[in-house]
């Protein structure tokens, strides 16, 4: 038996935790008037097979079948996670419709509905601070820390996951491409 730990005192490594799923989208067969013009794989069978293949290797994704055989609910870690899957499938020749992203709510032990929260860190030039703060204020973000670094500010927020949906585009516009934004799951 081979191991990477000391043979006399083997210690178990802590498992890697996977962040909670925060967004879901409905993936369905394209039934628009332009269906069948852009993709090679257009049927629900093709879509189903590809999505089930994806969840075998993508451990941070969940798939649910719906009442309709043509639609599937795909849950993932966030916008980027789901958009990478969509773009990969598009490049592989799949043609599909995608629904609006929805935040996955959670019930605590008392039955109270809770919303996923994200810890957001932003590095932005000082002259764009006002526009960024205004945009985040409208999205219910709460400033927890601000640090000055040369001509940049680092701002840390706690924000509902729904507040981050399509925020990246606004952020890049507000900072003229000079801002850096990172977020991780913070809890419910």
Residue locations for each model-derived region?
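Accessory interaction regions appended to the cores of large information-processing enzymes
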Residues: 1-188
């Amino acid at each position: 038996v081979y191991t990477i730990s000391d043979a006399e005192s083997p210690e178990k490594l802590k498992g890697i935790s996977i962040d909670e799923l925060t967004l879901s989208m409905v993936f369905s067969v394209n039934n628009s008037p332009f269906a069948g013009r852009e993709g090679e794989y257009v049927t629900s069978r093709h879509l189903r097979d590809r999505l089930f293949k994806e969840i075998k290797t993508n451990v941070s994704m969940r798939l649910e079948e719906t009442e309709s055989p043509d639609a599937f609910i795909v849950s993932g870690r966030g916008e980027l996670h789901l958009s990478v899957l969509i773009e990969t499938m598009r490049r592989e020749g799949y043609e599909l419709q995608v629904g609006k992203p929805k935040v996955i709510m959670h019930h605590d032990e008392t039955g109270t509905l809770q919303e996923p929260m994200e810890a957001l860190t932003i590095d932005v030039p000082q002259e764009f601070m006002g526009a960024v703060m205004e945009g985040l204020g409208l999205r219910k973000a709460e400033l927890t820390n601000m640090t000055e670094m040369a001509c940049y500010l680092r701002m840390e927020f706690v924000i509902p996951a729904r507040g981050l949906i399509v925020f990246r585009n606004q952020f890049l516009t507000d900072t003229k491409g000079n801002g850096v934004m990172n977020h991780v799951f913070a809890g419910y």
